[in-house]
Amino acid sequence: MGLASSNDFPDPLTLSPIRKVHIVLAGILFIFNSAFGSSLPSGAHDAIADSFHLAHDDTKLVLLNSLYLVGFAIGPLIFGPLSEHVGRRPVLIGTFSGYIIFTMACALSPNFPALLVFRLLCGLNAASPNAVLGGLYADILDNPQTRGIAMALFMVVTGFGPQLAPLVSGFVSTVSWRWTFWVGLAAAGVGYPFILFIPETYVPVLKKRHARRLAKAGKQEQNGCNTIESQGPGHRGDGILSIFMRPFVMIAKEPVLLFASLFMGFTYAMFYLYFQAYPIIFQSKTPISGKNIGLDQSLNFLADLYGLSPGVAGLAFLPISVGALVAFSLFLLYGSYHSKAVKENKAWAMLEEYRRLPLAALGAPLLPIALFWLGWSSKLSIHPVVPMMSGLFFGIGYILIFMAMINYLTDAYKQYSASAQAAASTLRSCLAVCLPLATNPMYGELGINWASSLLAFIAILLAVIPFVFIKYGQWIRSRSPFSQRVMKGELTERPAETVV
């Protein structure tokens, strides 16, 4: 690792197992709060609308989640590079503190515009773990299998948190919509002490601090001066501007990154569209049959199919959470199977594309199945549990796709993976902002059946992406500029953001 010669240099890989568990748990608690907060107002829309004198079907209510996701889109572009300059610890502590402050501000909001601003700022701070945790875990976990399990837990939590929030807010908002955010603040308070006491783990920052201590003690060695700046993603003349611009350059020049990001982006947008679609389906009282109506009538037309209360309707998200747990089990099983194949030197296991992408190929067809199931089983003559169970397939597919694609990007771009993940995170968050805004008009014009089917057809088109990558991924990467540099071993170093 090129550590300084002094024996007291803190190597994060040598931390005790208990200390590593603490760091992993701290990251999991932060990402849980980040994900939980993203959909926290979903079950409280009616109460918020009543408080601020808005119509229950006012499209502006969608902004409560969408603006949070705008913060998700912007945050990784800031906090990923920032963590490579000032370290993981100050970024995580600062952003978790910001998340807590602005969650409290949401609970105290005097009006609806103020609430929207505070939601944006919550999302901006909550985006930090999306950009930083992969690197944090890579800093301390050098065993690929252990690191893979940590990141699998990361993905399960990102799927479970948003599903739990509408259930909680649906029941709590019957007291007051403000209590929705007080509960979010309490949940953040549980995780905050864990973050406060994590150590710094980023080696280049630790080297700089250690060198400063040696200099103050009069023990600075010449080779220390020469190596302080030789580590990290930007050590060969990459300025701050270059580091911040790299995600945009990569998304334009790397087909693998672009199409993987589009696939994850649509899946992610569907995940958040469900928070708008489920209330339409499960909290209404009269069937939506797919009539074409004017915009002035469309939102009224969205009223009412099953007529469940917000709290009970929140139970519809539980099958998605169960699906996430099933996907985690499949991830572990395939990881074990692949590791065994590698030890046996099987030819297919040596190919980079087979390391994770078969999981995405398994998950991709499950999305259209879930959407067709949801769309065509949502009828008064069919018990609401039947369309709810479609979420099991969606949860499995969603998590499998994300676990596979995120790790594939890291495998493909190695030392550039931080920038690749930042680009992917920003693109998928942008899609997650835009698509849910179309939910009410789309379901109003097309009805539940055909609106869900339209999304299913798009999912079918995108489902070919992992299969194309499995067959042609290596050929595509060999002709892409950043991938070529990785394959040639340029700028090789211990990758700060490796997520295996």
Predicted ranges, named:
Residues 118-158:
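Cytoplasmic helix-loop-helix junction between adjacent transmembrane helices
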Residues 74-113:
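Conserved MFS/SLC helix-loop-helix module at the cytosolic interface between two early adjacent transmembrane helices
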Residues 35, 66-69, 104-110, 119, ...:
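C-terminal transmembrane bundle
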Residues 6, 19-58, 74, 129-134, ...:
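Extracytoplasmic
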Residues 37, 52-53, 86-87, 108-114, ...:
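Helix-breaking motifs and short loop linkers at transmembrane-helix boundaries and internal kinks
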Residues 1-38, 42, 46, 178-179, ...:
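Intracellular terminal tails of multi-pass secondary transporters
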Residues 111-119, 131, 180-181, 260, ...:
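Short hydrophobic/alpha-helical segments at membrane-entry points of transmembrane helices
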Residues 146-174, 182, 187-191, 323-328, ...:
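Glycine-rich segments within core transmembrane alpha-helices of 12-TM secondary carriers
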